[in-house]
């Protein structure tokens, strides 16, 4: 999702933009150490193809067809989210299957600031949208701390 949000630029995943001290009230204080973004490479893709991929990510959450598998991500979202959902079935010893549901996303859709990936391993209820809720809640929480509108 981050590569799509960055128009094909692959960056190393990171959790924080910096390390901060606390202020007198226990809130966010001064920046102690900034974590730089490390660019890995650029994917060789045309602008037209990248635009199609971005439109696909947007439609997964915001479209109205029967293929709009991530519509519940938008319910209660504070900003526009683009995402791709997925399901992977694996088999462990003895032939027992395990189903993992996944969401990769970025927000806001038009000016991405955050990319989020959620994996829900061994999901026994494929009608569950818990990975969608987790995705939306992470993005909403980030937006509360770092307004993206």
Question: Would you name each region that the model predicts?
Answer:
Residues 39, 47-48:
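A structural-propensity feature for long, helix-poor, extended segments
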């Amino acid at each position: 999702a981050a590569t799509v949000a960055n128009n094909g630029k692959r960056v190393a995943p990171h959790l924080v933009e910096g390390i901060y001290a606390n202020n007198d009230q226990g809130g966010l204080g001064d920046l102690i150490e900034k974590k730089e973004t490390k660019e890995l490479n650029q994917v060789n893709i045309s602008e037209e193809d990248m635009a199609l991929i971005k439109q696909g990510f947007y439609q997964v959450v915001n479209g109205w067809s029967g293929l709009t598998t991530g519509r519940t991500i938008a319910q209660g979202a504070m900003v526009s989210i683009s995402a791709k959902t997925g399901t992977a079935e694996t088999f462990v010893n003895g032939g027992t299957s395990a189903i993992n549901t996944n969401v990769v996303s970025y927000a806001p859709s038009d000016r991405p600031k955050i990319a989020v990936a959620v994996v829900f391993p061994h999901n026994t209820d494929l009608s569950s949208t818990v990975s969608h809720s987790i995705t939306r809640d992470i993005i909403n929480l980030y937006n509360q701390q770092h307004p993206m509108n």
